[in-house]
Amino acid sequence: MKPNSEEEEELVQGVGPWDECFEVAVQLALRAGQIIRKALTEEKHVSTKTSAADLVTETDHRVEDLIVSELRKRFPSHRFIAEEATASGAKCVLTHSPTWIIDPIDGTCNFVHRFPTVAVSIGFAVHQELEFGVIHHCTEERLYTGRRGQGAFCNGQRLQVSRETDLAKALVLTEIGPKRDPDTLKVFLSNMERLLHAKAHGVRVIGSSTLALCYLASGAADAYYQFGLHCWDLAAATVIIREAGGIVIDTSGGPLDLMSCRVVAAGTREMAVLIAQALQTINYGRDDEK
């Protein structure tokens, strides 16, 4: 369902020092969604990055260039962390400066195959604290937003996480990550097996970490975990989950480290701890050390 003009106006209004930034992020996410929807049906030129499963297309670059160039015009003193720029060698460092954290297409493999779970993700941090997140589910025209202290919404409707605390009643989401070597796959499958042995209702992989986290924020799932995601996958969604009443932590059970390439999120702390305790770690290094 596409947000109507009244809903868009409600989404971009607010009280706080970053209102203009939020408004621009919403409009850019909607513009990016139009580009992606059109490109979804067209022939794509696909290349790989870190592995055969880590894909990039010309649309990833086009959308990232649009978002970053427009933001630079409006906010020339701000810093940027963006997926494709980082893949090309840009340093991934979160400072105290106002910083935009951008994934132009989350779910690129889905996009290549025309599987309709694809999103644009724009996060914003100041003094290393996440202020807001905007995620546009392009194919369904769902706009997820969260602002620190102001709640989380989808097309203007307030989001609320599940309050489930029993793993045996939980639907858990995850993603595979780009590593596909035998040892990594063994641990990935073992983690799923542990949760299923604990009688979880199910474990799902949808091909987009940002949208999986949005589904968690909306109460459609009870928990999410992953090794191998990046700060641009996580930044916007973290604000949305927290503002929907959920918790986002490290897989060790400690506080979230945005650069650690690992996460557990849930509607309740009890659920997050249960998931974290069940997991065996897969080491992907850190975003700020690559």
Curated annotation (Swiss-Prot):
One biological process term in Gene Ontology: response to lithium ion
Keyword annotations: Cytoplasm, Hydrolase, Lithium, Magnesium, Metal-binding
Keyword Coiled coil annotated: no
Principal EC category: hydrolase
Annotated EC: 3.1.3.25
Chain residues that bind Mg(2+) 1: 83, 103, 105
Hydrolase recorded as keyword: yes
Classification via SUPFAM superfamilies: Carbohydrate phosphatase (SSF56655)
GO cellular component, one term: cytoplasm
Domain of life where this protein originates: Eukaryota
Oligomer status and interactors: Homodimer.
Function: Can use myo-inositol monophosphates, scylloinositol 1,4-diphosphate, glucose-1-phosphate, beta-glycerophosphate, and 2'-AMP as substrates. Has been implicated as the pharmacological target for lithium Li(+) action in brain.
Protein name according to UniProt: Inositol monophosphatase 2
Gene (name only): Impa2
